[in-house]
Amino acid sequence: MIEDDGMLLNFSTDTTEDNNDSKFNSGKVTGGRWKERRKLKMMMEGREPVKRKTFEELENSDMDTNKKPKSDSSGRKSYNQQSNNESVKDVVRPVVSKVNPSQVNTQIVSSLFTAARQVETSVNINEHDDKEEINPSNAPLAADNFDSLKIEQQLVNHLNEKMRIQKPTSIQKLVLPQLLSSKNNDLFIHAQTGSGKTLAFALPILSKILSMKTRVDRKSGCFAIFITPTRELATQIYHVLSELTNCCHYLVPCLLIGGESKKSEKARLRKGCNFIIGTPGRILDHFQNTQSVKEQLAVSLRYVVLDEADKLMELGFEETLTDILKLIHDISLNTSVYPQLPSRIMHILCSATSKGSVTKLGNVALQNYKMISNSHVTNELENATVPDQLLQKIAIVPPKLRLVTLAATLDSIHRKHIEQKKKKLDYVSRTVVFLSCSDSVNFHFEAFSSSDANHRNLVGESARLLTKGNDILPSFDPENDPDFICYKLHGSLSQQIRSSTLQHFSKTNENVKGKHLVLFCTDVASRGLDLPEIGTVIELDPPFAVEDHLHRIGRTARAGKHGESLLFLLPGEEEGYMEYIKPYHTKGWKLVNYTNDLLKPSFQNVNVKRSDKETSKNVEEWDTNATTWHLNVERRVLEDSSFKDIAMKGYASHIRAYATHISKEKKFFNVKCLHLGHLAKSFALRERPKTMGLQNTKNGGEAKKNSKESAKNKMFRLARMAVKQSSGEFNY
């Protein structure tokens, strides 16, 4: 009995201990999240959770790896030391090799001045001679006047007194007698940019109408149609004709362009007009749908002018132009009403360049035409040249430095503006920056116009005046207004914004007096626009064809005035582009060193402040200031998600646009030769292009799938597309 009691006592004690152990060391903990279960199990086992160290802590711990670890009295390492050593091993492998790069912040701030591709060009193959005496090639002729060209005296007086034009240019002297003669030949006018082609064909047409003894008014019919490739150029010709017809108010021009109200245009056409100016799509639309237009053309139409003919063909208007010409030629012409006018419809083509596409259009539109050119090259009109008084500069800039070098260039121009303003308080200078695509225009406009809160919108979101305290350029005085206005212009803007922006940039009034105006734009502003007082043209992105290069730089050095142009090229293959454009620059160019000629003068001996913290130390080293300026833009990309989206769109669109160069220039502009990481740096992006793609894919993948489109929604969508297509032609 005693043994049994002892056995029961021993058994009872063992059972209690086993039960306690089983409660403490039960096999599985259930319920809750796995992290909580893991923590609970480790606590039950008397262990602490392993804390993963950051990279900084790991680097600090590496400093003590050679030190002998402390041991306890038994000579063994403590448990905490063992767990810490094990944690180091556990941390290193997963972070480096197994973590998805889109899930961690792996940004690396690369230096602006390292790992740049070596510039291969050491000698300027087409040096500009500063000592050579230059006579402007597109200037008005000093020895001639409009009286000798048999223009109506009423028009000559208006030119001299109201428009302040006394002397004709060389192309005007050649064209006016041809259009005023009785031979009635079609003409192909080929002349340099800025040489006055608009007046060359507008003056004789207007003079011919004024010479008629018959009284005319807006009900007399349409005498001439002017077709242009862009809305901006059509608007400019409309303003020129409006100014010319101020001497004969009974003659009325009419503008027909996409983006405007067709109802208002129809009303103007029904009232009557003497000149129609517009883009191909809208003109064809009215010819097909507005009956009053056809009725006016039968009696009066005598002239059809195709301005910038090469661009009309390049933009795919060949079929539209063919339809317009067919409709015009199908109209039976009645010459008895105005016998003093030509007995047939005269066709006039105008272009600063002559290519195969223009010749093709000439064969369709012209009959027995005569070529008129003021070019020195008579047998090879392909080799159009830039104005002699234009100073061309070329800078070979690594892709990482494109943005900061552009800032240095604008700063240098602004310093000159400040010096000129000391002599003349209301001095206005204008600079045009050409870029390859609209998204790139948006990025550079935002980067330079809204770096902080010190700015004010002037024309919607497309024109901004920088105000006191703005420090986007090193030359800005924080105590004074910078007198700096940024504009943007591209085909994706609405027609109203495009028109108002261009008008604000072009007009010299109290709002812009004494200010430096900078326009960021695509090639929409490269054709035919006579923008006043353009001092410098900057081609940050090379043109898609050499003809576009000639038209871009043709915005400056117009009508005999001096001007400058700066072309940015990347090191490597793009350097061969200089040899390609050499025949067009007969007076040579200056090869600019981006370090000594641009960055150092702008960033030396100035204090560029950091945007993230205030520092009392003044830094005068140019490279440090340039780096600080660029990092300020990068920090803004990190902090402002909307600006980051603009930067990423600009970067992606720039690469897509880069791949669209014409085939014969692909050897200079090969997208496979671009360093995409360095190019991303020029858009203030720190992420690698691959990481950006992963993030975009992930974001797109997480978006919910769109349900199948209903028949009703599809009908409305197609209707909206039809309305949009009919409201305007190619949105250039």
Swiss-Prot record:
Residues 178-372 form the Helicase ATP-binding domain. This is ATP-dependent RNA helicase DBP7. ATP-binding RNA helicase involved in the biogenesis of 60S ribosomal subunits and is required for the normal formation of 25S and 5.8S rRNAs. One of its GO terms (biological process) is endonucleolytic cleavage in ITS1 upstream of 5.8S rRNA from tricistronic rRNA transcript (SSU-rRNA, 5.8S rRNA, LSU-rRNA). Keywords: ATP-binding, Helicase, Hydrolase, Nucleotide-binding, Nucleus, Ribosome biogenesis, RNA-binding, rRNA processing. It is an enzyme of class 3 (hydrolase). Its main location: nucleus. Residues 1-91, 692-711 are annotated as: Disordered. The gene is DBP7. It comes from the Eukaryota. It comes from Vanderwaltozyma polyspora (strain ATCC 22028 / DSM 70294 / BCRC 21397 / CBS 2163 / NBRC 10782 / NRRL Y-8283 / UCD 57-17).
